[in-house]
Amino acid sequence: MESSRRPLGLTKPSVDQIIKIEAEGISQSRLQLLNPTPGVWFPITPGFLALPSSKRERSFSLQKDKECLLPMESPLQSKRDIGIDTTAVLLKHLMGSRSNYCPDGIFTILAQGPMLEPVMETALKVSSGLQTAKRTPIPALILSKGTQAVMRLFLLGLRPARYCLRAFMLKALEGLHLLADLVRGHNPVGQIIALEAVPTSASLPLL
């Protein structure tokens, strides 16, 4: 007698009972559309892709499902596959949103690097007559950091220091040559900028 009694309190429903309760809220016509295979009883909740299965699966409550909104297609993407050129529209979008557009076709990002901000602030203060203290220029800061790095390499040995110094010098020469070509290309004809003679790799001492 005591073993046949059920325990008092809430009991956990079985999987079959959960599926039956959820299926009662779905119309029979909708179940026939979602499950065309006869004999398969599988309620499909919106927002989930389910394949017909002969096994009974546990699904979540229909009331807890959220609507999955499809991403809106932009006008540029809708015109992409029909042969319409959207380059001009994209450039106008970039000009108005994230960058400044120059007539020569160069985009300048609004957010500048942290190392350029002190120089710009100093230049503004000099032009307005509000400069009170002289700041350390950026090349001196870069050179001081490079000197500290080379000194640490010298502590490790002469060979890594010589290798790094040679790499630095080659990169500096490459940058100087590129800068000279860039200046000649951007300046109009008739204006000649006197550049210092750039030493070649042959005139540099071998480290």
UniProtKB/Swiss-Prot annotation:
Keyword Plastid among UniProt keywords: no
Pfam families in UniProt: Corona_I
Ribonucleoprotein listed as a keyword: no
GO cellular component: virion component
Record keywords, A-Z: Virion
Cellular compartments annotated: Virion
UniProt xrefs under InterPro entries: Corona_nucI (IPR004876), N2-like_embe-CoV (IPR044311)
Domain of life, source organism: Viruses
Additional information: The gene encoding this protein is included within the N gene (alternative ORF).
Family: Belongs to the coronavirus I protein family.
Free-text function comment from the UniProt entry: Structural protein that is not essential for the viral replication either in tissue culture or in its natural host. Confers a small growth advantage.
UniProt protein name: Protein I
Species of origin: Murine coronavirus (strain A59) (MHV-A59)
